[in-house]
From Swiss-Prot:
Region listing for G4, in residue ranges: 136-139
Region (G2): 60-64
Pfam families in the record: GTP_EFTU, GTP_EFTU_D2, GTP_EFTU_D3
Protein encoded by which gene: tuf
Entry's Gene Ontology molecular function annotations: GTP binding; GTPase activity; translation elongation factor activity
Positions of the tr-type G domain: 10-209
Listed name of the protein: Elongation factor Tu
Alphabetical UniProt keywords: Cytoplasm, Elongation factor, GTP-binding, Hydrolase, Magnesium, Metal-binding, Nucleotide-binding, Protein biosynthesis
Positions of GTP binding: 19-26, 81-85, 136-139
Length: 399
């Protein structure tokens, strides 16, 4: 297929397939690429190519993930699929594959199962904002009433976890039949279902805000004093844009301070502005070097606040991944590595949980010894003696 087809003028969206094991996530991923490849919008990816996902390391955690890309008439998509349940959990918690939306695959022969529930909960906790449902294997269910029952069950389950169950598009079809049809060179009723699914994804999952359109935030990595000019803080702009003349806040560790940007530099050249992804030095007016330390963030005023207490969804590494060899208990006090610094904190386990084993994922409450700029969705590593023993994401700010 001609490479020119991938023209980047279309808006880009990251999605993924989620759902219970053997409900057809990987088959659906293959079917989407097969059906769209017939329209010249994707390269045909075989099921086995997707299922033999390469292992990647994200924050020291090994995750098997397949990434495929395709287009619809309206958009360019990057689609992530994981072969194993544990890979999903790790992927969603570490943010290795950020999802702007997800396709929840449910076999109509089984209805929602344990991992269906777990993936919906994880999507809610880690901030996957939109879900579209594909009811798979409808060719294997003779009674349409049974399919309706499954549909109602799915809506209720989504509502239980705070998703708008009645508004979420539910598309019925068969991934396997669509894949067979497309491979045989046909465009039949099953392929049409895949196109219906992609239309729903196009219209229901909004195009995400670009990083440069978000509020400015830069984690501070280093601080220098330039005689006669003031204090320079360096770091990689995480989101937004910073311009000379902007009023900004220094947030975290110490009481919040307000200051003014008097210069932005990159590679020793002066710039008018720095944007998301740039490694910059920002010159601050009237800020003393001792007022700033690594671990603070430079941010648009009032856009982020310092906190010490939060709930989080975490994955604890196995021994094989270089994690702990033993469980931990209530009041465990590791370091939480947030953006650029380690902060000690204590962990409270949920009621009824006595200990957490390596390889578990669990919801915890954390209290840090000093405040850090945090918001829902902030990711962190849990470290002990410089080694990563876990990975997490803030699901709720408590104080």
């Amino acid at each position: 297929m001609a490479k020119e087809k991938y023209n980047r003028t279309k808006p880009h969206v990251n999605i993924g397939t989620i759902g219970h094991v053997d409900h057809g996530k990987t088959t659906l991923t293959a079917a989407i690429s097969a059906v769209l490849s017939r329209k010249g919008l994707a390269e045909l990816k075989d099921y086995s190519n997707i299922d033999n996902a390469p292992e990647e390391k994200e924050r020291g955690i090994t995750i098997a993930t397949s990434h495929i890309e395709y287009e619809t008439e309206k958009r360019h998509y990057a689609h992530v699929d994981c072969p194993g349940h544990a890979d999903y959990v790790k992927n969603m918690i570490t943010g290795a594959a950020q999802m702007d939306g997800a396709i929840l695959v449910i076999a109509s022969t089984d209805g929602p199962m344990a991992q269906t529930r777990e993936h919906i909960l994880l999507a809610r906790q880690v901030g996957v904002p939109y879900i579209v449902v594909f009811l798979n294997k409808t060719d294997m269910v003779d009674d349409p009433e049974l399919i309706e029952l499954v549909e109602e069950e799915v809506k209720d389950l989504l509502k239980e976890y705070g998703f708008p169950g009645d508004e979420i598009p539910i598309i019925k079809g068969s991934a396997l039949k669509a894949l067979e049809e497309a491979k045989a060179g046909g465009d039949g009723e099953w392929s049409a279902k895949i196109m219906e699914l992609m239309d729903a994804v196009d219209s229901y999952i909004p195009t995400p805000k670009r990083d440069t359109d978000k509020d400015f935030l830069m984690p501070i990595e280093d601080i220098f004093s330039i005689s006669g000019r003031g204090t320079v803080v360096t770091g990689r702009v995480e989101k937004g844009i910073v311009k000379v003349g902007d009023t900004v806040e220094l947030v975290g560790i110490k009481p919040t301070q307000t200051t003014t940007v008097t210069g932005v530099e990159m590679f020793r050249k002066e710039l008018d502005e720095g944007e998301a992804g740039d490694n910059v030095g920002v010159l601050l007016r009237g800020t003393a070097k001792e007022d700033v330390e690594r671990g603070m963030v430079l941010a648009k005023p009032k856009s982020i606040t310092p906190h010490t207490k939060f709930e989080a969804e975490v994955y604890i590494l196995t021994k094989e991944e270089g994690g702990r060899h033993t469980p931990f208990f209530n009041n465990y006090r590791p370091q939480f590595y947030v953006r650029t610094t380690d902060v000690t904190g204590s962990i409270q386990l949920p009621e009824g949980t006595e200990m957490v084993m390596p390889g578990d994922n669990v919801k915890i409450t954390v209290e840090l010894i000093h405040p850090i700029a945090l918001e829902q969705g902030t990711r962190f590593a849990i470290r002990e003696g410089g080694h990563t023993v876990g990975s997490g994401v803030v699901s709720k700010i408590l104080g």
